[in-house]
């Protein structure tokens, strides 16, 4: 599987940070291809203007239709006319791990990173297939959300992570938060590693980890528990967690 992503952005240099770590490894392995189109390169006036004042007044500037439309046209000429366009915006649907797993199979994709007060709505109506948000807060532009989506998808590519089970055991993969992790030394001050992790009993370790995942999710993200149908075993483990924590 290869992931092919195009990005429409005024600041392609921001994505240089992706050349390190997991994404850098995927790029070197040719498991991931990133291409960039800067709307400023498609502005037709001498000043290469990409924004203008909003109709109706108000603060800030709005990204213009034409430079974005031409940048998208160039991107689709390379990636394919039917390539889906995803706009990263606080007004979009909340991005989840389930959506990430779905999007990795929709490659190639074009990610549209807005700036300023936003993008002319007519561009969104004409060119955008989906809008996604990484949370209920405001950033300076869509570049960081685009990087978040790229990172989340890249982790799911087979062979990119160091261990074949790393992605399958991440938080949210099973709809739960991750369990606690420990490494050497065995004891730090008065805080020892839970004895079950030293037992060598893999069944007991798996049971403990699931119990911790269930308990942590209940404590921190009850919405995830409530939308999940717990099995009898999971409910029993969650009850044990409550008893042990009381």
UniProtKB/Swiss-Prot annotation:
Q: Cellular component GO terms, alphabetically? A: cytosol
Could you tell me the keywords of this UniProt record? Answer: Cytoplasm, Methyltransferase, S-adenosyl-L-methionine, Transferase, tRNA processing
Superkingdom of the source species? Bacteria
Give its localization: Cytoplasm
Residues binding S-adenosyl-L-methionine, per UniProt: 114, 134-139
Q: Which GO terms describe its molecular function?
A: tRNA (guanine(37)-N1)-methyltransferase activity
The keyword tRNA processing is annotated on this UniProt entry: yes
One GO term (biological process)? tRNA N1-guanine methylation
| Catalytic reactions on record | guanosine(37) in tRNA + S-adenosyl-L-methionine = N(1)-methylguanosine(37) in tRNA + S-adenosyl-L-homocysteine + H(+)
EC number of this enzyme: 2.1.1.228
Role this protein plays: Specifically methylates guanosine-37 in various tRNAs.
Which family is it part of? Answer: Belongs to the RNA methyltransferase TrmD family.
Q: Which PANTHER family match?
A: TRNA (GUANINE-N(1)-)-METHYLTRANSFERASE
How the protein assembles, per its UniProt entry?
Homodimer.
What this protein is called in its record is tRNA (guanine-N(1)-)-methyltransferase
């Amino acid at each position: 599987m290869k992931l092919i992503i195009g990005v429409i952005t005024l600041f392609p240099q921001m994505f240089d940070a992706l050349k390190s770590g997991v994404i850098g490894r995927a790029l070197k392995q040719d498991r991931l291809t990133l291409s960039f189109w800067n709307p400023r390169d498609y502005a037709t006036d001498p000043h290469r203007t990409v924004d203008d004042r909003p109709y109706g007044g108000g603060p800030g500037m709005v990204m213009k239709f034409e430079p974005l439309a031409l940048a998208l046209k160039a991107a689709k000429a390379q990636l394919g006319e039917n390539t889906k366009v995803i706009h990263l915006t606080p007004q979009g649907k909340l991005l989840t791990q389930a959506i990430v797993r779905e999007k990795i199979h929709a490659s190639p994709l074009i990610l549209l990173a807005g700036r300023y007060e936003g993008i002319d709505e007519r561009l969104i109506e004409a060119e955008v297939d989906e809008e996604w948000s990484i949370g209920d807060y405001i950033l300076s532009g869509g570049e960081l959300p685009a990087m978040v989506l790229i990172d989340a998808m890249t982790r799911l590519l087979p062979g990119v992570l160091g261990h074949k089970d790393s992605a399958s055991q991440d938080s949210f993969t099973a709809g739960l938060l991750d369990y606690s992790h420990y490494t050497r030394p065995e004891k730090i001050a008065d805080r020892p590693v839970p004895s079950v992790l030293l037992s060598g009993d893999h069944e007991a370790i798996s049971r403990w980890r699931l119990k911790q995942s269930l308990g942590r999710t209940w404590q921190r993200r009850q919405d995830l528990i409530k939308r999940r149908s717990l099995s009898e075993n999971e409910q029993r483990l969650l009850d044990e967690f409550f008893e042990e924590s009381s």
